[in-house]
Amino acid sequence: MRLRNNKNAKLELESCENVIKNFPFKVEKNSTLEIGMGKGQMLIELAQKNPQKIFVGIEKYPTVALIAAKKAKKLELNNFFIIVDDVENALDFFEGTFDLIWLTFSDPWPKKRHYKRRLTYEKFLKIYSKILSENGLIKLKTDNDDFFQWTLESLEKNGLNIINKTSDLEKSEFAKDNVKTSYEQKFVSLGKNINFVEFSFKK
């Protein structure tokens, strides 16, 4: 079911303590970033399991971001933060900050003329290279098989190091450590395979 737009979401987010409103905002090293956080299910669970680390989620839709913000407040998480913006506008202040970036079920932009909007296009890869720490990693999950294959080709073309990959995460050796998004849970329950790749800029 499609989420109904909350016209007051932006205003409500202004009063949420875990929403980053002013930049630059200092984030400690050894932090994790999720781009396209959605309702925050995966990132909030990771924050609960790893209270010694900082977790930041980017979500451009206020209605969805507010759900995550309220959930984090209820759980009294002090290591979880939200940026409500588009990825291209939000990352200028985080050079060398993140040890791990998650790209979770981002828009595959299936039309060929939109390929430059895909979050594994070279323009975005350059952004990630700047905000990752020296030994930082990127992990991607997607249910879109065509986007996954295109991503693998983009990574190879741009000289990145593919560390691990699978076209069926649920049946792979990586499943035991996988924390699911709400979107992911839905598609796994329907029998849809989930593609996964882990990569870095360091050879």
Curated annotation (Swiss-Prot):
The gene is trmB. Catalyzes the formation of N(7)-methylguanine at position 46 (m7G46) in tRNA. Keywords: Methyltransferase, S-adenosyl-L-methionine, Transferase, tRNA processing. Substrate binds at residues 111, 143, 181-184. The keyword Methyltransferase applies. Its EC number is 2.1.1.33. It comes from Mycoplasmopsis pulmonis (strain UAB CTIP). S-adenosyl-L-methionine binds at residues 34, 59, 86, 107. It comes from the Bacteria. It catalyses: guanosine(46) in tRNA + S-adenosyl-L-methionine = N(7)-methylguanosine(46) in tRNA + S-adenosyl-L-homocysteine. The keyword rRNA processing does not apply. The active site is at residue 107. GO terms for cellular component: tRNA methyltransferase complex. Pathway: tRNA modification; N(7)-methylguanine-tRNA biosynthesis. Belongs to the class I-like SAM-binding methyltransferase superfamily. TrmB family. GO terms for molecular function: tRNA (guanine(46)-N7)-methyltransferase activity. This is tRNA (guanine-N(7)-)-methyltransferase.
